[in-house]
Amino acid sequence: MNYYGNYYGGLGYGYGGFDDLGYGYGCGCGSFRRLGYGGGYGGYGYGSGFGGYGYRSCRPSCYGGYGFSGFY
């Protein structure tokens, strides 16, 4: 439940990201079909990239993602 899952490259494990790694708290445009607290392209749940919050918020990078995304 880290607020800084993986901002920038999907280095996080189980936190999804640019490389769609695992699932959970994703960030930025990269988490494809990430359920739960994902984000990015097609990801729905909480979080996402550029201040995206709610469902299906596709924003590049992970700057101030609302919820559990990026390093808010």
Curated annotation (Swiss-Prot):
Q: What's the protein called, per UniProt?
A: Keratin-associated protein 19-5
Domain of life of the organism encoding this protein: Eukaryota
Subunit structure of this chain's protein: Interacts with hair keratins.
Ordered alphabetically, the record's keywords are: Keratin, Repeat
The organism's lineage?
Eukaryota, Metazoa, Chordata, Craniata, Vertebrata
Would the keyword Repeat turn up in this protein's UniProt record? yes
Q: Which PANTHER family match?
A: KERATIN-ASSOCIATED PROTEIN 19-3-RELATED (PTHR38140), KERATIN-ASSOCIATED PROTEIN 19-5 (PTHR38140:SF4)
Pfam hit, one: KRTAP
Mark the transmembrane ranges: none
State the InterPro entries in the record. Answer: KRTAP_type8/19/20/21/22, KRTAP_type_19
Q: Which family does the similarity line name?
A: Belongs to the KRTAP type 19 family.
Described by its record, this protein's role is as follows: In the hair cortex, hair keratin intermediate filaments are embedded in an interfilamentous matrix, consisting of hair keratin-associated proteins (KRTAP), which are essential for the formation of a rigid and resistant hair shaft through their extensive disulfide bond cross-linking with abundant cysteine residues of hair keratins. The matrix proteins include the high-sulfur and high-glycine-tyrosine keratins.
Q: Quick check: keyword Magnesium in the entry?
A: no
